[in-house]
């Protein structure tokens, strides 16, 4: 068969079945172009593929390629200085008065050119790709003015031109109220955020719409206005909600059929029931939990009880989660949030794809995209168990296999 090859002699974690990794021992995968044609036990490989080129993976583990479904990797500047200040005892208010906090990132991002935003994001993207990532979600939200928000989304789109990766863009104009609109959140939404969303959509820059529903950001009623425009434009929504307190954002997101509700440390059982009914994914972000030394753990037991899918992501951002490792995120999800290793792996594959509304990836099955990761480990749990070690042997992106050097 033309342009078809076979990966064989692998232990496959197909992620097709919950609770067992969907394991296939001594497995094989037939790939044509960017599509998986067949997968299963090597002994059952159809004769159709007998003459195709084959690569023996010698017992290595193959999983779906990783998906980072919540990042802020496009931004200007850094916040290492305020990290030191916080460790020396400075309060949030003191950091802000010294020019730190999100204001410093907004200032640096507004000052950066489009090329500079792309150049700054590439090393962060490269770190993710080096750990088997094939798909990355990238948010705006550090411009908070029309041109910078648009430039952030343009930069995100350009990343896929520089690297072999799929990028999904999210408009996050309702991330914070900029200094020039202090105390006038509604005016900011009406005069800047919503017109910018319309402009970004008209330019083809937006795959989804997000917001930050929190006491320090926007109320549920204000986020509802953003979601109204998203619905008018035919865009799916997601929401940062219940991270620092309970504000009712999860209920709103579920009512609007959100793809995901993210952070959710303060979500309740009622929220879990609402998410289960709407099919929304709970995106857990242990990097931010760790960095800001949070103590309120997401209600994982309630999510399990009600069948809410759970994803994991880096939440890579300069302030609360300067994290560019999904492997470390797996470990954090298990040690901090008590996910099982299987739940963690599902969280960066099957459920991460669901959180982005992508049905063509995140599992190993015929008809799906051939985005795979090949690991020098024998047990899937090792991916979450080991710390500071990258066992990636090769990444298969759209059917093209690149062995890590």
UniProtKB/Swiss-Prot annotation:
Keyword Glycoprotein listed:
no
Function, as annotated: Catalyzes the hydrolytic cleavage of the carbon-nitrogen bond in imidazolone-5-propanoate to yield N-formimidoyl-L-glutamate. It is the third step in the universal histidine degradation pathway.
Residues holding Zn(2+): 70, 72, 240, 315
Q: What is its EC number?
A: 3.5.2.7
Per its record, the protein catalyses: 4-imidazolone-5-propanoate + H2O = N-formimidoyl-L-glutamate
List the GO molecular function terms. Answer: imidazolonepropionase activity; iron ion binding; zinc ion binding
**Name of the molecule in the record:** Imidazolonepropionase
Required cofactor names: Zn(2+); Fe(3+)
This protein's record includes keyword Iron: yes
Concerning Pfam families, the annotation shows:
Amidohydro_1
* Sequence similarity: Belongs to the metallo-dependent hydrolases superfamily. HutI family.
Q: How is the cofactor bound?
A: Binds 1 zinc or iron ion per subunit.
Name the source's superkingdom. Bacteria
Keywords (A to Z) from UniProt: Cytoplasm, Histidine metabolism, Hydrolase, Iron, Metal-binding, Zinc
GO terms under cellular component: cytoplasm
Q: Which InterPro entries match?
A: Amidohydro-rel, HutI, Metal-dep_hydrolase_composite, Metal_Hydrolase
Per UniProt, 4-imidazolone-5-propanoate binds at 79, 142, 175, 243, 320
Where does this protein act, in terms of pathway?
Answer: Amino-acid degradation; L-histidine degradation into L-glutamate; N-formimidoyl-L-glutamate from L-histidine: step 3/3
Specify where it is mainly localized: cytoplasm
Positions with a binding annotation for N-formimidoyl-L-glutamate: 142, 317, 319
Q: Which PANTHER family match?
A: IMIDAZOLONEPROPIONASE, IMIDAZOLONEPROPIONASE-RELATED
Provide the binding site for Fe(3+): 70, 72, 240, 315
* Localization of this protein: Cytoplasm
Q: What organism, scientifically named, is this protein from?
A: Ruegeria sp. (strain TM1040) (Silicibacter sp.)
- One GO biological process from the UniProt record? L-histidine catabolic process to glutamate and formate
